[in-house]
Every structure is written in structure tokens, then in C-alpha cells.
């Protein structure tokens, strides 16, 4: 038997591409629909498998909420898809993350739900219980313990192998899996990584290696650089109002590995009335969320 080579022929690549196009044409291969039509239109009708989506925003802008809406929407809007979700949540405990989900769903404050701002009513507690019961129907697992990139790769590989099967021909079949990473900078540095930028470069390379091998859709949340808060960036009607590629923390490390790069902004929190050179009317409303599609592969 000939030893496998590290390359494939051009014919193999074209055959694979035609098979993929035929699968999409017949509806056998579909993207993960999101709750926003503008998101679906900007991408390939949603999030594709074997891809990485990076979402960057200031703290308290709502990137975790958007991630939760993407995950919940994936189950509700794609009922015929068979997939799992693995969430890496290092910022807070799972119970605290769940309470934040209740907060977003009920439009009630975290303090109120914890009876620290008036006692939680029986009615609202019941709404939380119903939400939790509905969410528990979905196959979602959570990693709370911070890890470095070596451990991250091992966890993902173990998870994908655990939820795989072998067909009659002896080929291993992996289950489609959405993997979220809440706050990429909370990963620990591995030996040999000098700083957070080294870690982000390793993260990008690891995500690419994993998404090539497994049917994974990564959703990675990232912070922004402090330059976004420069006073001139928050003057009305300026191009700098928008989230730019260079604003993403570790953009050089993550951009080349991301299939989709999104910047979230709440211009009203910076007291902006007219957003960007198009002068979109925001009028200082902090509830308006702008979603910038910086890169769509």
C-alpha cells in the first residue's frame, strides 16, 4: 500500500467542491441560520461548518448576549440539523451565565433576579424556570476551568471523539458542533508563549487546524484595543465611529484565521448622536446596537 502524501491532486479539490455545491443546491448541506436576516445576507446564508466567527466589542456591549442568541437561535431556526454545543466560559460560573441569560430573556436586571433590587416575584421566577426547562432540551456542555491552548486542543479533540461514530466502511463520522469561546484573552498561556499576543497567534492556528479536521463552527468573543476610546473616535459623524479591523484585540493574530469578523458597538453609550460618515441617527440611545461585518470570507 502506498504511503499517503501530504498533498492532494487538483482533481480531488474540484471533485470535493462540486460535491459541496451539489449538496447545497439540493439542500442537503446548509449553513446555520441566525436570528438576523442581515447577518445571513452578509454571510453564506448564516454560519458555515468548518468556520471561525470572531466577535469583538467593548465590555458591557452585549457580545455574550449575541453569542447566546446565536446558540439558542441555532437550535430554534435549524430544527432539522443534528448538532451539539460546547461552550468555554472562563469569565463566570455556569450558574451566573445562566442568570445573565434569564436577564436578557426577561429584560430584567441581574440584581433584581438575585433579589438584590427588590424581591424577585413568583411570576418572574416561573418565567426563569420555564426558560431553563426549555434550554435543557438542547445538548449543550460547558467548560468552566481555564485552560491553555494545549489543553484547549485536547478537550476539543476528546469531545469530538466522544460524540463520533464509525460507519460500515470503518470511517469515523464526527458530529457537527458549535464551539464558543467567551473572552479569548482568558485562556492561559502555554509554555513557550511569551505574552497574550503569542497566545492569540497560537489560538488562531489551533482553531484553523481543528476546523479543518472536524465539522466545527467556532464563535470566539474578543475585546477591543483601547484606541477605540480615543475622544476623536467618538465625535459625531466620523469614520472612526465604526469598529475597524485594527480595533480587534490581537487583530493580526486572529484576522487571517477568521472566516467572519464582526465588531459590535453601542454608539449611544459614547453620547454619539450621528453615527459614521453616513450620519445614522442614534441620538445618544444606548440601546441601539450596531453590527459591523468587517470580514466575510
Model-flagged regions — what are they?
Residues 113-118, 141-144, 189-199, 232-244:
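Flexible beta-alpha connector loops of hexameric P-loop NTPases
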Residues 86, 169-208, 217:
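Helical hairpin unit composed of two closely spaced alpha helices linked by a short loop
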Residues 33-36, 95, 122-125, 129, ...:
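Amphipathic alpha-helical transducer elements in NTP-driven molecular machines
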Residues 2-108:
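The Walker A/P-loop phosphate-binding site
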Residues 93-99, 187-191, 227-232, 270-274:
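Switch/connector loops and helix/strand junctions flanking conserved nucleotide-binding motifs
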Residues 205-297:
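Phosphate-binding/switch region of NTP-binding enzymes
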Residues 19, 34, 43, 77-174:
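Cytosolic-facing regulatory segments adjacent to core modules
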Amino acid at each position: 500500500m502506498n504511503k499517503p502524501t501530504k498533498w492532494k491532486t487538483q482533481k480531488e479539490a474540484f471533485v470535493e467542491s462540486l460535491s459541496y455545491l451539489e449538496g447545497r443546491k439540493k439542500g442537503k448541506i446548509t449553513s446555520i441560520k441566525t436570528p438576523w436576516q442581515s447577518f445571513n445576507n452578509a454571510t453564506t446564508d448564516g454560519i458555515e461548518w468548518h468556520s471561525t466567527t470572531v466577535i469583538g466589542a467593548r465590555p458591557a456591549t452585549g457580545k455574550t448576549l449575541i453569542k447566546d442568541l446565536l446558540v439558542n437561535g441555532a437550535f430554534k431556526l435549524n430544527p432539522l440539523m443534528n448538532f451539539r454545543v460546547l461552550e468555554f466560559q472562563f469569565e463566570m460560573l455556569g450558574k451566573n451565565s445562566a442568570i445573565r441569560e434569564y436577564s436578557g430573556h426577561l429584560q430584567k436586571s441581574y440584581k433584581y433576579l438575585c433579589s438584590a433590587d427588590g424581591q424577585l416575584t413568583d411570576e418572574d421566577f416561573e418565567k426563569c424556570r420555564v426558560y431553563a426547562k426549555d434550554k435543557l432540551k438542547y445538548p449543550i456542555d460547558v467548560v468552566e476551568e481555564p485552560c491553555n491552548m494545549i489543553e484547549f486542543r485536547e478537550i476539543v479533540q476528546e469531545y469530538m471523539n466522544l460524540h463520533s461514530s464509525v460507519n460500515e466502511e470503518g470511517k469515523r463520522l464526527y458530529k457537527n458542533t458549535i464551539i464558543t469561546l467567551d473572552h479569548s484573552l482568558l485562556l492561559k498561556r502555554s509554555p513557550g508563549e511569551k505574552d497574550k499576543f503569542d497566545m492569540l497567534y497560537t489560538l488562531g492556528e489551533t482553531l484553523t487546524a481543528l476546523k479543518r479536521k472536524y465539522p466545527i463552527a467556532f464563535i470566539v468573543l474578543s475585546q477591543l484595543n483601547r484606541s477605540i476610546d480615543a475622544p476623536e473616535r467618538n465625535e459625531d459623524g466620523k469614520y472612526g465611529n465604526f469598529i475597524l479591523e485594527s480595533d480587534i484585540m490581537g487583530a493580526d493574530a486572529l484576522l487571517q484565521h477568521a472566516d467572519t469578523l464582526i465588531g459590535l458597538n453601542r454608539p449611544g453609550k459614547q453620547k454619539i448622536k450621528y453615527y459614521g460618515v453616513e450620519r445614522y441617527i442614534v441620538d445618544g440611545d444606548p440601546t441601539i446596537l450596531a453590527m459591523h461585518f468587517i470580514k466575510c470570507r
